[in-house]
Swiss-Prot record:
GO biological process: anaerobic cobalamin biosynthetic process; protein tetramerization
Catalytic activity from the UniProt record: Co-sirohydrochlorin + 2 H(+) = sirohydrochlorin + Co(2+); siroheme + 2 H(+) = sirohydrochlorin + Fe(2+)
InterPro entries: Anaerobic_Co-chelatase
Entry similarity comment: Belongs to the CbiK family.
Gene Ontology molecular-function annotations: cobalt ion binding; heme binding; sirohydrochlorin cobaltochelatase activity; sirohydrochlorin ferrochelatase activity
Gene3D superfamilies named in the record: 3.40.50.1400
Role this protein plays: Catalyzes the insertion of Co(2+) into sirohydrochlorin. To a lesser extent, is also able to insert Fe(2+) into sirohydrochlorin, yielding siroheme. Its periplasmic location means that it cannot participate in cobalamin biosynthesis and its genomic environment suggests it is likely to be associated with a heme or metal transport system.
Protein name: Sirohydrochlorin cobaltochelatase CbiKP
An annotated GO cellular component: periplasmic space
Signal peptide stretch: 1-28
Amino acid sequence: MSRHPMVTRLLCLVFSCLIILACSPAFAGHGAPKAQKTGILLVAFGTSVEEARPALDKMGDRVRAAHPDIPVRWAYTAKMIRAKLRAEGIAAPSPAEALAGMAEEGFTHVAVQSLHTIPGEEFHGLLETAHAFQGLPKGLTRVSVGLPLIGTTADAEAVAEALVASLPADRKPGEPVVFMGHGTPHPADICYPGLQYYLWRLDPDLLVGTVEGSPSFDNVMAELDVRKAKRVWLMPLMAVAGDHARNDMAGDEDDSWTSQLARRGIEAKPVLHGTAESDAVAAIWLRHLDDALARLN
């Protein structure tokens, strides 16, 4: 039976990491079982936009404040982002590289917290990596993975409430707010319409659109036409206000959401703040991390 190319690449990477571990002095010999050493691995898609990076830094600060006795490490799932960061001299390990490094440092139990928005392809790839590292003879004893932002129906409702708490103070009643998600061909794209349902229960002028999924920007425009909107707020539904937020949402290009709104006579008010900058939204990720840590025991 042939393997999916992604699975084959993952296995090759894991085996390469295991060879490195096997040759490491930290794993030489057959001493007594290691004492439990717990760590946290925060995993984001990543961003190459320097102005957007403080959002992730702030998330890391929150995690360290909540768990001051547990070391925190980082990894990034986007290969292209890792390459750009490394070209700038910034350490940017993949999840597999980070887990191998933590095993070499002597960690035995690791809570991996996804900072993705939905359980799409990136999150499921992270699950496969984490499962591959758990229970290896000279690796990590236990690895648990915290859900992404919208991991359950209850999360969708909580995220809707958190987004309402994060709305711009200058927004006037009746002014639509459009949250831009990434979108995906993965079945998890259904999370966006699910979030839309809970937002509409709170405020009928809160809309969800995506760059590559559903609802599309055409769907959003249809809703704005019904509302005869003259002023619309645009906010990223992504952990950071990176390339999509600054170009696809707020850019000067003809196909940006801001430009398309302007051609219809609608004033766009982009807000370049990722969801990881919102304390209310971040609290949901922190709860997922607490659950992941609890599952280590």
